[in-house]
């Protein structure tokens, strides 16, 4: 397994997905990136079991295919020291030894067994709900609500963003029982009624990726997991189980007092 890749491009992709890696992993293999080279496509996966991120990079100079788990911290620390240059990865598939050749020298990394890396959860087709959304809409929905989520171990449903699909609108809700934010978009029509609770950590990771993208996002979910697919990236997260509070009941419907203020002055 051998390929050539830009040092800065690789680092950019690893930094995007590397934030999911926990400092307290229960499985040592989760301290690694999974490199999966097939044809001219390199898929790199990072996971903490609850959330999995996958990034895809198209390559031009490839010899053979294969998989290997690469120590995340070691690789990222090395890449941060390289200026922009082509890097050659040469992996011995029997020993899993990784030889990294740069313009300044040669480096060796001990890879891990890729078969130990956990499988990505799949959305069950018989229970799947799917829709296409503009990346701007998903970004705004997360960005305008995530600050209001709670950090409450006793009420985990409050620690995520409640996403509610209706026939003619899409609503994002977050509350910590002291403040509540409802962000509703009328410019989309899901044409179905459903909902899920998106945990805070993967929501934050997705927001970071969406801030650089202008595209369509494919959203699909079942009763256990949600998946977001956009150009070059995929994120799969386990959903928070439970019933979200009836947020509409605490929003006044006939409050006679209204105030309009300048946002910048405020």
Where are these regions (language model features)?
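Structural preference for solvent-exposed beta-strand-turn elements
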Residues: 1-266
């Amino acid at each position: 397994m051998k390929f050539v890749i830009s040092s800065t491009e690789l680092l950019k992709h690893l930094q995007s997905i590397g934030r999911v890696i926990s400092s307290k992993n229960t499985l040592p293999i989760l301290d690694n990136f999974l490199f999966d080279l097939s044809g001219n496509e390199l898929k790199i996966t990072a996971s903490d079991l609850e959330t999995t991120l996958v990034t895809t990079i198209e390559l031009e100079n490839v010899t053979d295919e294969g998989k290997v788990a690469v120590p995340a911290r070691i690789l990222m620390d090395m890449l941060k020291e390289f200026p922009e240059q082509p890097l050659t990865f040469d992996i011995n598939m029997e020993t899993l030894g990784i030889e990294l050749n740069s313009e300044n020298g040669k480096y060796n990394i001990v890879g891990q067994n890729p078969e130990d890396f956990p499988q990505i959860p799949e959305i069950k087709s018989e229970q799947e709900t799917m829709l296409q959304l503009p990346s701007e809409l998903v970004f705004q929905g997360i960005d305008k609500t995530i600050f209001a989520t709670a950090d409450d171990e006793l009420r985990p449903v409050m620690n995520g963003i409640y996403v509610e699909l209706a026939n003619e609108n899409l609503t994002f809700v977050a509350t910590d029982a002291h403040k509540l934010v409802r962000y509703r978009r009328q410019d989309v029509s899901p044409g179905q009624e459903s909902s899920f609770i998106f945990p805070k950590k993967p929501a934050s990771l997705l927001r970071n990726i969406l801030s650089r993208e202008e595209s369509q996002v494919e959203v699909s979910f079942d009763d256990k997991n949600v998946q977001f697919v956009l150009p070059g990236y995929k994120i799969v997260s386990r959903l928070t189980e439970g019933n979200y509070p009836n947020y509409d009941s605490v929003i006044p419907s006939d409050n006679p007092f209204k105030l309009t203020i300048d946002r910048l002055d405020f």
